[in-house]
Amino acid sequence: MLDWVHRNGKILLAIRPIQAFAASFVSISFAIYLKTLGLSISQIGLILTGGMISSTLFNLGAGFLEARLGRRKLLVFFGLLSASAGLVFSTSVNTSILIGAAILASIGYRGGFGAAQMLERVILAQSCEDSRRTELYAIRNTVGSLATATGSLFTGLLVLLASWGYSEAGAYRVMFGIFTALNLVLVFLYILLDEEAEIKLEETKQVVLGPETKRYLVLISVLFSMDALGGAFITQSLVAYWLFERFGLAMDKIGMIFSASSLLAAASFMAAARISKRIGLINTMVFSHLPASIMMAAIPYMPTLGTSMFLYLGRSLLSQMDVPTRQSYTMAIVKPEERARFQSLLNLPRSFTLAIGPSIAGYLMQFIGIGTPFLVAGVIKAVYDVLLWVTFKDIKPPEEEK
């Protein structure tokens, strides 16, 4: 099974569900936990923004330092950083210290925007043949999404801990302790990666991006920054807060909604790999993502929880098809030796717009309307979809040119 995947690729596939499980239950409970400490939603948005700025700097640094320090050492460092932040959250009640740890380690975000995941995707790209690259990314995202679903349900432990006599804050600290332990497991698995994970000797010279790659970098950066800005308005932490405030849902119910969302996303990942072989990567990205963007914009106008969740879950089934296809496409159109540098530079403007989004969303939720971020996100993402198709529909990856 998976005999076409290099050993390092298999290790990274084992890492992904642990990583996703831990990030899922923390990101769902993060904003609500900070609210119990007395912070407003606009302040929480600023903390999320600070975390993404920190992640952006680490992302950029990893792209430039991977050849000098090694990918494995960087991955171990990022794993220890997350574990340390989790330890702080599980032991401290000092708000200032918690905010510092959250910003430094980007606690509260779920997804593939961290420096560790950027390095993992680069290693994965060299763990199989080009013809199966999209399939490998789809498998990685599928196991991650299934683990995210499980992690979402795991937030129900908060309710169980409360029934056992734990205080509200004490229950949250137990969850962060589990987050710490899981990140230490990730560190151990990163250590198992072999030399093939590193940049090849002939690639260790200063990488200079070619003219065509630079052109792709500018175009994709602008477009992906738009998509990231839209996504930043609806992070899992902020959606959980919206469900908590708008409908008064308990954490176990919120966890069930996110679990269902992740299961639908998991189904879409493998479908994306199959569909992309028939209609191409760009067409798969746009034709699935555009309807999802329209659904997102309509969510706050739904009169009941049921109708809102019908659209939210429908969006989950469609919107994530662009994840493995996007990851595969951006690896395919550049040379192997350019990939890490390209990805780190590509993520820089994207991470910036992702960083400012939660602050704006928090302001909109507090002062304009709690559902406003859904509308803004949907409109931005729909414009992105159209521009992406117009710009890149004729630029094919190698496997589509054969």
What are these regions (language model features)?
Residues 58-70, 159, 268-281, 365-366:
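Helix-to-loop junctions at the C-terminal end of transmembrane segments
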Residues 73-88, 283-298, 378:
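Structural signature of the two symmetry-related core transmembrane helices
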Residues 32, 149-170, 356-375:
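Transmembrane alpha-helix termini and helix-breaking/packing motifs in multi-pass membrane transporters
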Residues 57-93:
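Conserved MFS/SLC helix-loop-helix module at the cytosolic interface between two early adjacent transmembrane helices
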Residues 2-57, 216-224, 228-258:
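Helix-loop boundary and gating motifs at the non-cytosolic
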Residues 103-144:
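Cytoplasmic helix-loop-helix junction between adjacent transmembrane helices
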Residues 180-200, 384-392:
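C-terminal membrane-cytosol helix-exit motif in multi-pass small-molecule transporters
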Residues 17, 85, 95-115, 307-321:
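Hydrophobic core of transmembrane alpha-helices in multi-pass small-molecule transporters
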